[in-house]
Amino acid sequence: MSLYDRDYSRSKEFENTRSSELSIFIKQTYQLFAASLLAATVGAYVGIFALASFFIQSQVTFWILFAVEIGLLFALQWKKREAPLNLVLLFGFTFCSGLTLTPLLISVLALPAGGIIIAQAFALTTVAFAGLSVFAMNTKKDFTVMGKALFIVLIVIVAASLLNLFFQSSIVNLAISAVAAILFSFYILYDTQNIIRGNYETPIEGAVALYLDFVNLFVSLLNILRSFNSR
């Protein structure tokens, strides 16, 4: 009987250890996510108040920064386990991501009550993100199986966005933004469940996933609100 008791005790100890490690992992992920949002906010602030003239004069500035942003993201995926380089790359990427939001933010700020529109989009994004995260953590429904379907929809949205660069249709842009808002809402459910189940290798991966979900949902909602307020 004592043998079974010892096995049970060891099993219980292992479960407690794993649960503790997962809790630390989740805590670190959300701390990095919050810090990433702060870095992006600083980037957007610098873009609006220090680099706005460069964005207004030429689109080249945006595309250069966008290329740097993508490069930093790939570098981060490659060096995700190498501290402190991974943190430098993470905050470099999110700061640069904030900079690339400058053209959109400037266009909204040029509208009547543009600041209020941005605040509304941010508030809606925050409430939606919090609500969806809580739902994902408590529901019995498994959203982690939706990865392939979500990725296919993402590819379609990217392709449609690239095509609309040529057509410049406001209706198509509104439709893309609406679908994107729904897509990234599901991505929040998907990524949150992957994080709480420990499916990411590092907290940085989880933080980047949540950051991209939040920012893309914010951009989608901001585009929708801008469309309605510019008519």
Curated annotation (Swiss-Prot):
One Pfam short name: Bax1-I
Protein localization: Cell membrane
Transmembrane feature ranges: 36-56, 58-78, 83-103, 143-163, 170-190
Alphabetical UniProt keywords: Cell membrane, Membrane, Transmembrane, Transmembrane helix
GO CC terms in record: plasma membrane
Domain of life according to the entry: Bacteria
InterPro entries found in the cross-reference section: Bax_inhibitor_1-related (IPR006214)
Keyword Transmembrane helix on entry: yes
Family designation: Belongs to the BI1 family.
Protein name, as recorded: Uncharacterized protein Cj0236c
Organism classification: Bacteria, Pseudomonadati, Campylobacterota, Epsilonproteobacteria, Campylobacterales
